[in-house]
Amino acid sequence: MKTPKLLLLLSFVALHLDAQAAASSLSQILFSSNRSSAWRLWLVNADGTELKQVTKQDTDDQDVDPMFSPDGKSVLFTSTRAGKTGVWRMSFDGSKPERLCDGDQAEWSPEGKRIALRRNERILTRDLAGGTEKTVSPEDWPHCSGPAWSPDGKSLAFAARWESGNAIFIVPVGGGKPVKVYDKQGACEPHWSPDGTRIVYETETHICTINPDGTKNRVITYFGGVQRYARFSPDGKSLVFCQGASEQGPWELYVIPATGGTPRKLTEGGSDMYPDWR
């Protein structure tokens, strides 16, 4: 019995679409590593394949804390290029680097037209087109760090020194009174899930997630060592983080389900930190 031509055509289309889906699911993780001596930006597929170096300047400058732009065409990062720590932007392939401003720990807004950053222990937003800046954290709050845009672009999560330790807060992007989310175990480095329903953060030793209203706090990494700098996957189902035997490292990247589970090693060799996932 011959297979009808229409069924053959439909089967071919289905296989083609499956192949496209498999290719598109191969997401990438951008991170900073000292495996080439100075800290440089590197890229690896989320399955651990195709590791490659992105920034390759022949200097002792340090490139850290990278973040993909929302459209994936540019990268925001902190660098000591030009002799002073600042926020830089470049094309995804490492070309066309440009210094944007003083500061560090910069993060794109969801629409890609603004950034949030830290400068002199304050949290600011900056318009990329005109350079207009606005201080978001209260002027009398010391030691603010780690700004992170909410997916709807209306709020920023950040950490601040609070009483005997750190605490995580959320503040409207336009300014206002910050609302405390969590203030125990040195909580810092907050980052939102893609749907805005969870925030991942780090304590002195582990990675946790929590609702933005401070409820349903959950420890994700129960194992030994120290875990830092966690970020959600684009679909919100996984987390990438760096793991070290101690605060001195060396650090390696791991991936774990966002609800906890068995971690999978992603990189090894040198120290790998500050991952961002697209």
Regions flagged by a language model, labelled:
Residues 20-278:
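Sequence signature of WD/YWTD-type beta-propeller architectures
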Residues 7-16:
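Bacterial N-terminal signal peptides
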Residues 1-7:
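Bacterial N-terminal signal peptides that target proteins for export
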